[in-house]
Amino acid sequence: MTRLLVVYFLISALLVGLDQWSKYLTVQNISLGETKEFIPGFLSLTHLRNTGAAWSLLEGKMIFFYVITVIVSVVIIYLLIKNYKKSIWYSVGLSFVLAGAIGNFIDRVRLGYVVDMLQTDFMNFPIFNVADSTLVVGVICIFIYLILDEKAAKEGKNGTN
């Protein structure tokens, strides 16, 4: 395994650690259902238990989430190992998506639900967590890679962004 590939897996591990640490702090310091102002007018912390996905979709379907998460994680690890030199955008994106999937998977296996805590005060949006955020950032990075790769292909380059 090359150093670069180790860096991408280290990124995932650090993000999983940050996610689990934030959930631990939430459970230890905020009662279930309680809200604490964090950044006034912007972000509050609300301790919730989510047995589904975003917006509580597929609530209670834990076996489904276990199977999908394992499959997705294996595919991402395979793609990262095979393509880690392809693009920093692509590889960082995969690392972030992997971290998000694993972070929420740990909660589901250990607790039977996912701990959510981040609540936007400036707009009505479902309460989420660090793992959810890393998933979104990862997908954005992969989209940037796809856009840059398509642009490079149109310009006749080899498409390595």
Curated annotation (Swiss-Prot):
The chain crosses the membrane at residues 4-24, 61-81, 87-107, 127-147. The keyword Membrane applies. It is found in: Cell membrane. It catalyses: Release of signal peptides from bacterial membrane prolipoproteins. Hydrolyzes -Xaa-Yaa-Zaa-|-(S,diacylglyceryl)Cys-, in which Xaa is hydrophobic (preferably Leu), and Yaa (Ala or Ser) and Zaa (Gly or Ala) have small, neutral side chains. The active site is at D116, D132. Keywords: Aspartyl protease, Cell membrane, Hydrolase, Membrane, Protease, Transmembrane, Transmembrane helix. It is an enzyme of class 3 (hydrolase). The keyword Transmembrane applies. Coiled coil: none annotated. One of its GO terms (molecular function) is aspartic-type endopeptidase activity. It comes from the Bacteria. GO terms for cellular component: plasma membrane. Its EC number is 3.4.23.36. GO terms for biological process: proteolysis. Pathway: Protein modification; lipoprotein biosynthesis (signal peptide cleavage). PROSITE patterns: SPASE_II (PS00855). Pfam families: Peptidase_A8 (PF01252). NCBIfam families: lspA. This protein specifically catalyzes the removal of signal peptides from prolipoproteins. Belongs to the peptidase A8 family. This is Lipoprotein signal peptidase. The lineage of its organism: Bacteria, Bacillati, Bacillota, Bacilli, Lactobacillales.
